[in-house]
Amino acid sequence: MDSPFKTIALIGKPHHEGANQTLTGLHQYLTTRGFKVLVESRVAHTLGIMDENVMDLVQLGEQADLAIVVGGDGNMLGAARVLSRFDVAVIGVNRGNLGFLTDLSPQDYLLPLEQVLSGHYKSEHRFLLEAAVYRHGERKSSNLAVNEAVLHPGKIAHMIEFEVYIDGSFMYSQRSDGIIVATPTGSTAYSLSAGGAILTPKLNAITLVPMFPHTLSSRPIVLDADSEVRLLVSPDNQDDAMQVSCDGQVTLAVHPGDEILIKKSKHKLHLVHPLDYSYFHVLRNKLGWGSKLF
């Protein structure tokens, strides 16, 4: 097959029977068609593959042209935070629940995948956020987020106080359960559950969504994605186990008086889709919107 992709990485959901079946089928399909197939180490161990083509996510990103992620959106998010640092295209086979980011059905993924491998696909780039925690002016920790960065308390049902600055300008102070800073990709995730607006993927925008604020006037706001969001945590907070959560998978410790900077990352996730992909079809299907009347 004459393909724009020569080296393909397989990344998956370890110890998941359905995902393992799909990964095994993909490995056989790709190797018999002459592709160089690299396998994520956790997946390889589960499938019993032990050779020089087994490697970690960073090595996969350095060597692969295309990465196929088999699992749910959580698996895609974990892989995407690493793969976004490299010029590698990513497509997903859904073996999770909603599957906003994993286009291909596990029942009939071969035909659309074959079209993608032959060079017939749609391509898009999704920006990520970078969240960093500063303490007494020193950068203590940082990470990337595909969906959202969330400041939240460490104690259940315990409000925290903080100030919000946009590009250095004070916006408001807030007493709440925290705040969500979401990308367009993340606007259909935690942000949506908290009452935030859905942002279409091509928008250069982010949304700030308060979490149970102790006021009737605080509402979500949409900002230019090139804005720098600064959260100044009140030193009077009694909770010393606060966190910034990136995609619900990576946590950064936050203490009273800390400062959190959230801004658009220089890294982008390169997604590829089948030619019949439609973002609004995905929304309609995943969120249960009404179908056409006539």
From Swiss-Prot:
Key words, A-Z: ATP-binding, Cytoplasm, Kinase, NAD, NADP, Nucleotide-binding, Transferase
Source organism superkingdom: Bacteria
Cofactor(s), names only, from the UniProt record: a divalent metal cation
Binding-site residues, NAD(+): 73-74, 147-148, 158, 175, 177, 188-193, 249
Top-level enzyme category: transferase
EC number: 2.7.1.23
A GO-annotated cellular component: cytoplasm
GO MF entry, a single one: ATP binding
Subcellular location: Cytoplasm
Entry annotated with the keyword 4Fe-4S: no
An example Gene Ontology biological process: NAD metabolic process
Keyword ATP-binding: yes
Residues at the active site: 73 (proton acceptor)
A Pfam family this chain is assigned to: NAD_kinase_C
Family: Belongs to the NAD kinase family.
Function of the protein: Involved in the regulation of the intracellular balance of NAD and NADP, and is a key enzyme in the biosynthesis of NADP. Catalyzes specifically the phosphorylation on 2'-hydroxyl of the adenosine moiety of NAD to yield NADP.
HAMAP family (alphabetical): NAD_kinase
UniProt protein name: NAD kinase
Organism of provenance: Aeromonas salmonicida (strain A449)
Gene: nadK
